[in-house]
Amino acid sequence: MLSIQHGCVEIEFHGGAQVVIEGPAELELITDMQVRCNQGKLYAEVPPRAVGFEILSPDVTVVDRGTEFGMEVTRAGTTEVHVFSGKVDYAVPLAPEGSMKLLEGKAILVHRSGESKTIPIRPASFTTAPPGGNSAAWEKSTALLRSDPTLVVQYTFDAASLASRTLRNHAPMAKPESHGTIVGCTPTEGRWPGKLALDFKLADDRVRFALNRQHERMTCVMWVKPEMTGKPFTALLMSSAAAPGEMQWQFDQNGRLVAGKRILAGWGDSNVEQIDTGKLLTPQRVGTWMQLAFVYDGSAGTFTHYLDGKKVEAGTISTNPPLVTARLEIGNWTPLDGSPPDAERGFVGSIDELLIFSRALHDDEIRNLWNIGREL
């Protein structure tokens, strides 16, 4: 029996399957082609030579057919199965259907009673490699996220994008206007050697793109290395218009992270509802890489801030209007005509990743994204 209280363990089986287990977990390694999981969360990558690799839980038996999949087994008597690529066969002991197939991009929740239902796939919930691994592990995790249909923006700041001056959106079904136009900005080193970023120094440096959507729920995750600007606000991701629902995400002059949306049309501050954190951009953090994230849940009327995978602030906000993303700017921000003359926002520093989801990510998903993406 293998018992893991905290952290992650990666096992490569003689048959070729690779499994990453996240604690707390209890596993029994039966053979090099069969594992029993009584509790825990795991990610499995199974090459062709290991087709038929089995993972058993008290609720379901999963037989791999050459794929990547994740499982979460709880003490409460449920098992989740998420298929990121390929397909698996699964059998529920108390269900009359016998063996069934679960295809790529699908996920199920199985109860110990034998009942099961389809659930949204959540690749960000699963750790694909132990934290602090290497760039290959980050690239694997980045590719895995593309199986999530709610991923609407994925900027990796890859070499081809920076060379072409167009920041490619790697999200599935990305629309042409969602690819970012790089204005100014120069390539620089990112979080680790070999990782690229964009450096923002001049007032015109920014990335422009459009994401013409209304969001009942939304998550933004950014890796950023901010410097002091000397201006009242340091812009991260801002909408260009002053229509109801338009979003804003920035630091204020006191180093507090601010996220919110415009409730009424117009540029006045009274038209905006926002949630502020305590001081996060301290002198010690200036010039260092950090993961920033916010989660907006319109049905609950909440904004939640995260720093380096940890929740730092949450607050309530009006449920209407929905959060709107139209024309957006990363970094320095200049609003459309009709705004007050002091409305511009500066940004000095580097950015090397941006993710936007059209759902509210869970705490563990934000933490996993930080774990796999932190500096090597």
Where are these regions (language model features)?
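Glycine-centered tight beta-turn/hairpin loop motif at sheet-sheet or coil-to-beta transitions
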Residues: 14-16, 59, 95, 202-204, ...
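Carbohydrate-binding surfaces in secreted/extracellular proteins
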Residues: 294-316
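Short, aromatic/His-centered strand-loop micro-motif at the edge of beta-sheets
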Residues: 265-291
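Extracellular/lumenal ectodomain signal focusing on beta-strand-rich modules
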Residues: 39, 85, 154, 184, ...
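Flexible glycan-contacting loops in extracellular carbohydrate-active proteins
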Residues: 191, 315-350
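Flexible, surface-exposed loop/linker segments and immediately adjacent secondary-structure boundaries
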Residues: 1, 5-108
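Extracellular glycan-recognition modules
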Residues: 148-154, 159-179, 188, 199-267, ...
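Extended recognition patches within non-cytosolic domains
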Residues: 104, 113-115, 119-149, 302, ...
